[in-house]
Design a protein with these regions (language model features):
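N-terminal carbohydrate-binding accessory modules
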Residues: 1-48, 66, 322-323, 329
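Short, solvent-exposed mixed-charge patches
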Residues: 334-335
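Catalytic domains of carbohydrate-active enzymes, especially glycoside hydrolases
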Residues: 32-54, 236-240, 244-245, 287
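Short, solvent-exposed turn/loop segments enriched in Gly/Ser/Thr/Pro and often Arg
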Residues: 52-55, 192, 294-301
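Substrate-binding cleft and catalytic face of glycoside hydrolase catalytic domains
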Residues: 37-117, 122-134
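Residues within well-ordered alpha-helices
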Residues: 36-37, 82, 234, 280
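Extracellular glycoside hydrolase catalytic/binding regions
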Residues: 23, 92, 98, 104, ...
Length: 335
């Protein structure tokens, strides 16, 4: 990290632009991962791949109706192969711990193991925690007691599981990584399902260790994302001071495909015009925000591709592919 930009080991500025390749967060074996990664890099011109993973699969505990008999060894080796595919092609890999709610002790344990595994590969970036939400900024940063726990197997609803849980906070995840000796670049999502970065410019920025490659902040945005604030407060204020990584961004075809989106959230955007898709890519390009389009999987919406022949979706994938190829998009309206 140099100011609000990323530089490589030769002090050249790096602008990460790529794709989020999903399935290892819900499947111990993944869906066509070793086929999708080369296509994303070689044919879609991604210089970065985001790889969501889950700590239960990593440690071989199973989940999502699946069991593992090898203690997670085959899962970890598959991640190794994906990392190698990216490294060999000159691309970066973002290892995303795909958890929701509040950082917990098991998430720190994951990073103690995963960071040690990849600490000698500087092209691996550690995204500490997918989407924090429903906790105050002091707990987000420093940990503390929760009014209610969260079940991160419930991806959308995030239903309450245990009351009285204690979050370790995001700083503890940073410390877990650095405690292994790993100096890899770290990415940390804000509150509001990683939409709200207002706290990091108001006293809650995380602290790196001397020699660490730095911390960038993660922003997730979709047409329904607003949570009472626009782009200026949610991301641009932070972008003036810190590198930003938009690790999830996606346009949708119709509201009814996403039943969890409330009517009030639907009113904020007319998705039929495709204006949001153009404007968000324009915002990213105008501010040189790092980004990975969500999702390079045909059934994980909002989808960049419509099938396993990697046909771009008309409502999102075509624009993502154009942007990755260098086509400029005009920001007509800031939300």
């Amino acid at each position: 990290v140099v100011g609000n930009r990323l530089h490589d080991g030769h002090d050249r500025e790096v602008w990460l632009q790529g794709l989020c390749i999903d399935s290892l967060e819900w499947s111990a074996g993944g869906d066509r991962m070793l086929h999708s990664v080369p296509i994303a890099i070689d044919l879609w011109h991604a210089n970065c791949v985001r790889l969501p993973v889950h700590q239960d699969f990593w440690f071989g505990r199973g989940g999502h109706g699946q069991t593992q008999s090898d203690g997670g060894e085959s899962y970890r080796k598959l991640v190794d192969r994906i990392v190698d595919e990216c490294t060999q092609r000159g691309a970066y890999l973002v290892l995303d711990l795909h958890a929701f709610g509040a950082p917990m002790p098991e998430h720190a344990l994951f990073w103690q193991d995963a960071a040690a595994r990849y600490k000698n590969n500087p092209t691996v970036i550690f995204e500490l925690f997918n989407e924090p939400h429903d906790i105050p900024w002091p707990v987000w940063r420093n940990g503390g007691s929760l009014a209610a726990g969260h079940d991160d197997q419930q991806v959308v609803q995030n239903t309450i599981k245990n009351s009285g849980d204690h979050s370790v906070g995001m700083q503890a995840l940073v410390d877990a990584v650095r405690g292994t000796g790993a100096m890899n670049l770290i990415a940390a999502g804000g509150l509001g399902w990683s939409y709200d970065l207002s706290g990091v410019v108001n006293g809650y920025a995380l602290t790196d260790v001397p020699g660490g490659h730095g911390i960038m902040y993660v922003w997730h945005t979709y047409p329904w994302s607003h949570y009472g604030m626009g782009w200026q407060k949610s991301v641009l204020d932070a972008a003036a001071r810190f590198p930003i990584f938009v690790t999830e961004v996606g346009n949708i075809r119709r509201w009814e495909d996403f039943s969890f989106i409330g009517k009030d959230q639907q009113k904020c955007e007319d998705i039929t015009t495709m204006a949001w898709a153009h404007d968000i890519l324009g915002l990213i390009q105008q501010n040189k925000l790092n980004w990975t389009g969500f999702s390079f999987h045909p059934t994980c919406g909002p989808s960049v591709i419509s099938d396993w022949t990697y046909t771009p979706t008309s409502y999102w994938g075509v624009f993502v592919k154009q942007a990755l190829a260098g086509q400029p998009f005009v920001l007509a309206r800031v939300r």
